[in-house]
Regions:
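Alpha-helical/coil-rich non-catalytic "connector" segments in signaling and regulatory proteins
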Residues: 1-134
Length: 135
């Protein structure tokens, strides 16, 4: 079964490049949803229930950190990744507080992004797959 992945990025070109990269390397593993801002991200999250979410930190509507906090209220296992141009320690600390799986800085290398998403998919899949009963 394919993993549902939500990308929330307010910059159109950045979002399109990000989605194109994900489709190129992981297209057979993912179903991709795109949000232009934090509010749209929350609407898509509620409707589609993606297993992995990539959030920009600074977006209109709600920031990526606010979106992550709201996601955590209903889904403790969603794989959250931050992709941001802000190299601020305070943001990184807040990302840790919402149990983000990764915090990538722009500009990113394609392989760095792909590895982070693959790792998130693995972690989320392991959490959601019931363990077999002990013998």
């Amino acid at each position: 079964m394919k993993c549902k992945l939500l990308v929330a990025e307010d910059e159109l070109i950045e979002r399109k490049v990000l989605c194109k990269t994900l489709q190129k390397y992981l297209g057979d593993l993912i179903v991709l949803y795109e949000a232009r801002n934090g509010r749209e991200a929350l609407e898509l999250f509620a409707r589609e229930a993606p297993q992995v979410v990539i959030l920009d930190i600074e977006m209109p509507g709600y920031t990526g950190l606010e979106v992550a906090r709201k996601i955590r209220e209903t889904d403790k296992n969603c794989g959250i990744l931050f992709l941001t141009g802000y190299d601020k320690f305070a943001y990184a600390k807040q990302a840790i507080a919402v149990r983000a799986l990764d915090y990538l800085l722009k500009p990113y290398k394609e392989q760095e992004l792909v590895f982070a998403v693959e790792d998130a998919i693995r972690q989320v899949s392991a959490q959601r797959t019931p363990l077999p009963p002990r013998a």
